[in-house]
Amino acid sequence: MSGHSKWATTKHQKAVKDARRGKEFAKLIKNIEVAARTGGGDPAGNPTLYDAIQKAKKTSVPNDNIERARKRGAGEEAGGADWQTIMYEGYGPNGVAVLIECLSDNRNRAAGEVRVAMTRNGGSMADPGSVSYLFSRKGVVTLEKNSLSEDDVLTAVLEAGAEEVNDLGETFEVISEPTDLVAVRQALQEAGIDYESAEASFQPSMSVPVDVETARKVFKLVDALEDSDDVQNVYTNVDLSDEVLAALDED
């Protein structure tokens, strides 16, 4: 199972608790705006918007902010920006692969901020295609365990196209092809299982084990990248053992 997923879960829990909360809110709001602009402002007919709103609600974004973002994206209210998705590729400490997904209204600013964060934290930019081939676009649904077993989840989602269910400690992660994401999410809902988020994400096709020191350096790089308002998501191919995760949790 992907150490990056366990890491991402830990990072999300920390983000909700600390000063990064405001930045997290801003990124979720941007997702809603883009989803509404791309597929229309009605969540019932726009699964991407539905899922963007669900994730924002689960992260405690105020309903007023969610509704205003939906209206801006749908053109019902003025003020929506022309957000563009831009992908950057690079290498982190010890040659770890890094894929950076930006959502920006200023390509030059985004490129500059990504480059500065990389070079100041032991990373380097890479040519397009030199890193992205190490990742696959997947549908990812995360849900809190509560009293569920892995078999409970698997039974609910198997026929909907789920490929695997990963145990991430306090949560489960259901992986599918992006085209099966909505079916998997709906299968969970029909089984009466609540979920935290459902979104398309990049998953490493092969993960690289790293020691604690390298993990700390990669963590520092990812944090620096995510500090940019233009950066939505950062993906790496690190594989963190339980021992390394435990050491990181103590930091």
Curated annotation (Swiss-Prot):
Signal peptide: none annotated. Its main location: cytoplasm. GO terms for cellular component: cytosol. Disulfide bonds: none annotated. It is found in: Cytoplasm. Pfam families: TACO1_YebC_N, Transcrip_reg. Gene3D superfamilies: 1.10.10.200, 3.30.70.980. GO terms for biological process: regulation of DNA-templated transcription. GO terms for molecular function: DNA binding. Transmembrane segments: none annotated. Belongs to the TACO1 family. HAMAP family: Transcrip_reg_TACO1. This is Probable transcriptional regulatory protein MAB_2888c.
